[in-house]
Amino acid sequence: MTNLRKTHPLMKIINDAFIDLPAPSNISAWWNFGSLLGICLIIQILTGLFLAMHYTSDTLTAFSSVAHICRDVNYGWLIRNLHANGASMFFMCLFLHVGRGIYYGSYLFKETWNIGVILLLTVMATAFVGYVLPWGQMSFWGATVITNLLSAIPYIGTTLVEWIWGGFSVDKATLTRFFAFHFILPFIVTAMVIVHLLFLHETGSNNPSGLNPDSDKIPFHPYYTIKDALGLLLMVLLLLLLAMFSPDMLGDPDNFSPANPLNTPPHIKPEWYFLFAYAILRSIPNKLGGVLALLMSILVLLIIPLLHTSKQRSLMFRPISQILFWLLAADLFTLTWIGGQPVEQPFIIIGQVASILYFLLIIALMPLAGLLENYMLKPKW
């Protein structure tokens, strides 16, 4: 009798995706982040489900319902801290996953890459609407400022903003619909993750060398299941350390005050994982221009496959492009820092230079470096 996992219609799918999947023998720890993101998504859905059992999406009771979860619900404080810091872990893994894709040329799997970028946008939307739910000061003003950006769209902008708000300001209707969106979006994300994996398994994984790995494949289980388990252990350790010992380290102190439409916080800023995009938005002194730059900061990822000029796939053997890649990483750190600073000199000019450099590196400098490296590969005799 053949093994059930190879014959049963459902088990066969799981087997082909996680057990007998042929994987390159040389993929490094940078390939762990896909599985870590899957775990993050499961953690977020489970903790979110338990929070939703006790949360009320009403402007009068939302803030106190979150306080009630932390004070009166069994392990409510832990569930809430895991959910809030789980989002930070999610984005940490996301950024590293995307960075890996850029470094090793994984973006040349165009379908997998494109759905990945759409996934990134969807997760960002989910995190944004989720941040509004506790109805603290920064929740309220963050929602007001970010939704207001849509009013920059010519002709339909103002109508669109009021339609999203469900009134003339961020109020009860806004909170209720944001809760509905925050509940449904993770399931849409899960469906998209399955499609992401489907496209990936059409081609098989890339590897650090960027060469065709077909000549040397090993089964996913036990080799990469155990390797992923180690990554999972380290991530859960970091998450638990964060949630248990300093749960509010990455949050904003303003969110301990209930939302007050009559009192604007001195510095309105989003969570750390949006600061780089927020810095790009603020670096352009025009509203519509800023909104377009904000959108482009993520959508530029979609054109990276079209800008690949090198004869080699990976950056492993391309020292000039490596320098530019790490310059891009440093630039993103700079933008993240600037996004959290007040709008005054010298932060304004640093943000503007960093924003220009961000787009310049991706659109011009890295493709040019690829061409230069191609030229340097040619024998000169």
Curated annotation (Swiss-Prot):
It is a multi-pass membrane protein. GO terms for cellular component: mitochondrial inner membrane; respiratory chain complex III. The chain crosses the membrane at residues 33-53, 77-98, 113-133, 178-198, 226-246, 288-308, 320-340, 347-367. Heme b b566 binds at residues 97, 196. CDD domains: cytochrome_b_C (cd00290), Cytochrome_b_N (cd00284). Keywords: Electron transport, Heme, Iron, Membrane, Metal-binding, Mitochondrion, Mitochondrion inner membrane, Respiratory chain, Transmembrane, Transmembrane helix, Transport, Ubiquinone. InterPro entries: Cyt_b/b6_C, Cyt_b/b6_C_sf, Cyt_b/b6_N, Cytb/b6-like_sf, Cytochrome_b, Cytochrome_b_C_euk/bac, Cytochrome_b_N_euk/bac, Di-haem_cyt_TM. A ubiquinone binds at residue 201. Pfam families: Cytochrom_B_C (PF00032), Cytochrome_B (PF00033). It is found in: Mitochondrion inner membrane. One of its GO terms (molecular function) is metal ion binding. Its main location: mitochondrion. Binds 2 heme b groups non-covalently. Gene3D superfamilies: Cytochrome Bc1 Complex, Chain C. One of its GO terms (biological process) is mitochondrial electron transport, ubiquinol to cytochrome c. Heme b b562 binds at residues 83, 182. Heme 1 (or BL or b562) is low-potential and absorbs at about 562 nm, and heme 2 (or BH or b566) is high-potential and absorbs at about 566 nm. Belongs to the cytochrome b family. The cytochrome bc1 complex contains 11 subunits: 3 respiratory subunits (MT-CYB, CYC1 and UQCRFS1), 2 core proteins (UQCRC1 and UQCRC2) and 6 low-molecular weight proteins (UQCRH/QCR6, UQCRB/QCR7, UQCRQ/QCR8, UQCR10/QCR9, UQCR11/QCR10 and a cleavage product of UQCRFS1). This cytochrome bc1 complex then forms a dimer. Component of the ubiquinol-cytochrome c reductase complex (complex III or cytochrome b-c1 complex) that is part of the mitochondrial respiratory chain. The b-c1 complex mediates electron transfer from ubiquinol to cytochrome c. Contributes to the generation of a proton gradient across the mitochondrial membrane that is then used for ATP synthesis. This is Cytochrome b. It comes from Isoodon macrourus. The lineage of its organism: Eukaryota, Metazoa, Chordata, Craniata, Vertebrata.
